[in-house]
Amino acid sequence: MKTVRGIVESTGFFTAEEIEVAVELVDAGLSGESISDYLFLFCEDVSGKVLGYTCYGRIPCTLGSFDLYWIAVHSDHQGLSIGKKLLVKTEEKIRNMGGISVYIETSSRDLYKPTQGFYLNAGYHEEATLKDYYSPGDSKIIYVKHLS
């Protein structure tokens, strides 16, 4: 999907491999292919242009735990609270599906400091860090928010 590719490329955060994964997930999800339980939420402007999206889903073999796999807003539209609104609406959908907790993973690299702050400001807390997970010096940080 060109729209999702444009969004994730514009952020400057994702590798070529990650961009391909994002596009494949949305393509498969929207075509009706069975690819587990990936769900999507898109934010559009009044003309129908997609400005950002989330990809989330129930974590298999858990009771009420969900992963937020992707959240991205086109760089032309960042700073307008679109990401915050997408996150809040995604949490609402998760809560309505019986969700209890939302988990988010991100990189420890300096590039991701704004992302880490975004999650903290949204009420998530750091649950764990997996040292050198992505590569030497690039750890995985896992955030969680317990929904009420």
List where the protein language model places each region:
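Helix-turn-helix
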Residues: 115
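Short glycine/serine/proline-enriched coil/turn segments at secondary-structure junctions
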Residues: 60-63, 110-111, 133-135
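Active-site-proximal loop/turn and secondary-structure-junction residues that shape catalytic pockets
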Residues: 72, 108-110
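Acetyl-CoA-dependent GNAT
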Residues: 1-69, 74-76, 84-89, 93, ...
